[in-house]
């Protein structure tokens, strides 16, 4: 969970860590997704500026880690490198919708548990 957000998203997109050609674009898209996550109730407002920001700086729950990471990857993939196939595009969108629902439910449960305490 201590891995770099930018580096891990680059790896999932098939971009080597050493290649910095797309870093500015990826950082912009990643930060846009963090705004969406915050609006869904996941995490505090958060942005990255380079490869030094790590996942555990954004999310402290190991339980939600992979869901958040998958969500950020899929959203960035659609923004940065959308698939040519409409069938693949619809599959990505369906996965994103499901992850949004699950993240929102988890955030609401966490919020109601905190309020009840």
Name the predicted role of every residue range.
Residues 7, 66, 72-74, 90, ...:
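Short alpha-helical segments used as structural interaction elements across diverse proteins
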Residues 1-64, 101-117:
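Conserved short "hinge" loops at termini or chain/domain junctions
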Residues 78, 82-117:
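Protruding loop/beta-arch "assembly-hinge" segments enriched in small, turn-prone residues
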Residues 53-81:
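Mid-chain, well-packed structural core segment of small domains
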Residues 3, 62, 68-70, 86, ...:
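Helix-centric, low-specificity signal for extended rod-like, repetitive segments
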């Amino acid at each position: 969970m201590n891995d770099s957000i930018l580096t891990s998203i680059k790896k999932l997109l098939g971009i080597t860590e050493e290649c910095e050609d797309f870093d500015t674009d990826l950082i912009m898209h990643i930060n846009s997704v963090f705004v969406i996550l915050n609006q869904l109730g996941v995490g505090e407002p958060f942005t990255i500026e380079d490869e030094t920001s790590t996942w555990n700086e954004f999310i402290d729950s190991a339980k939600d880690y992979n869901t958040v990471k998958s969500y950020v990857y899929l959203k960035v993939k659609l923004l940065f490198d959308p698939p040519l196939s409409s069938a693949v595009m619809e599959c990505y969108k369906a996965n994103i919708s499901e992850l949004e629902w699950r993240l929102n439910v988890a955030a609401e449960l966490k919020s109601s548990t905190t309020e009840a305490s």
